Amino acid sequence: MKYYLKEEFLKDSGARNAGNKARNDVEEIVKQEGFSPLLPTVEDWYKMSTIKAQQHKAQALSQAFSRLKSGDQLLIQFPMLHHSFFTTYLVKRLQARGVKVYFIIHDLEVLRYVNLDTVPLKHKIRVQLQESSLLKIADGLIAHNRIMKSFLVNKGISEQKIVSLGIFDYLIPDFQEKEELSKDQPIIVAGNLAQEKAGYLYKLSENPAYNLYGVGFDESRALENETYFGSFLPDELPVALEGGFGLVWD
């Protein structure tokens, strides 16, 4: 049988950002492809000591994995929400029982942290070791694009077991395509608008105009050619958007 690991956020499950959107869409798509959920029972390990939290997450994962049999396939979204120091060991043990394990990658922490001076070196090393050890043993990986694929290959992961997804799917219930778009309309920027993520928004030139959607925007610093519309849930955002072209950034 085909399964996907259904991990649930312990906090901020209804946050007005796209953090959960990609994961939820992957789950919806694989369910349509015949995958069944494999749900680990996890308590709030944020309130536990480091050692106890690691043990609790490993035990929850082990219990979920115990349902799988030889010939089964398991898809895991990466990074895992409830990763532990024992995850690589548990996946190896699962594979030894004849289960194929695949990962679809949303983010690589090592790429996000590599140029940040604020992240301690020991944390960078720990993240790199955890990511590389787990991804190297996967039976297959779905990467963002050829650049991420090349990065993984350079880390020693076999090119033959990596495929590139390209642009992520974005499921929109009851979507209706908007008409009469033109280049004369304001440019749309949607996402995390905080200074540390989108600092350029606070020093744009006078033209063109921009329509902004998302969390973290400092309205007191809004420019004359910027209109802030607030934040929306991911499924509600496409309907609320007003403007012409969208600006892709990160």
Q: Locations of the language-model features?
A:
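Carbohydrate-associated surface elements
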Residues: 147, 167-168
